[in-house]
């Protein structure tokens, strides 16, 4: 049997994430310390203490998710789990590249932080948003967006990641 690890994109972050693993596994603490060093600020403190209003900013979310993902991968590796293949959804592709040995962890932290900054500049806070719509057919999502467009303003159905 083959084993695959798939790393998540942004959106799964929350204040307090991985604090238990940080306290239990030295490799998790090491990864967070390396991320802090690469960023020049404490993503560790932001992940564990917040505030959420700062953690959700994409320039912070992206290195936080990458750090958490790679730290979890390292714990699994220490426990004897080795994937035959790795992949990632959106931002998770960077975690997969680190797990595959293609990209250095600290370089990846820096790159996704810059990626997040540029994304935030492109769409400043309060100027737009994305929402995950679950369990609706594509056609219904498009129809609802069109109804909103007719009454409120510009809403587009994009990034269809899976059926329903």
Predicted regions and their residues:
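A broad detector of short, well-ordered amphipathic alpha-helices
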Residues: 33-34, 67-71, 93, 106, ...
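Alpha/beta catalytic cores of group-transfer enzymes, especially the acyltransferase/condensing modules
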Residues: 10-13, 39, 100-164
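Gly/Ala-rich beta-loop-alpha elbow adjacent to hydrolase catalytic centers
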Residues: 69, 84, 88, 92, ...
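Short, glycine/charge-rich beta-strand/loop segments that flank catalytic centers
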Residues: 53, 87-91, 128-132
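Helix-rich "cap/lid" substructures immediately adjacent to catalytic or cofactor-binding pockets
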Residues: 2-87, 151
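Basic, gly/Ser/Thr/Pro-rich low-complexity segments located predominantly at protein N termini
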Residues: 14-16, 21, 45, 93, ...
């Amino acid at each position: 049997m083959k084993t695959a690890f798939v790393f998540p994109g942004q959106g799964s972050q929350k204040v307090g994430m991985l604090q238990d693993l940080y306290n239990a596994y030295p490799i998790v603490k090491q990864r967070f310390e390396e991320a802090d060093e690469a960023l020049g600020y404490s993503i560790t403190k932001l992940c564990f203490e917040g505030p959420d209003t700062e953690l959700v900013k994409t320039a912070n979310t992206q290195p936080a998710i990458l750090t958490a993902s790679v730290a979890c991968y390292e714990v699994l590796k220490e426990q004897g789990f080795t994937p035959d293949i790795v992949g990632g959804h959106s931002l998770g592709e960077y975690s997969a590249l680190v797990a595959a040995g293609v990209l250095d962890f600290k370089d990846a932290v820096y790159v996704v932080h810059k990626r997040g900054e540029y994304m935030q500049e492109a769409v400043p806070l309060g100027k737009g948003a994305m929402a995950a719509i679950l369990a609706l057919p594509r056609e219904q999502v498009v129809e609802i967006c069109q109804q909103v467009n007719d009454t409120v303003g510009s809403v587009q159905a994009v990034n269809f990641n899976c059926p329903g």
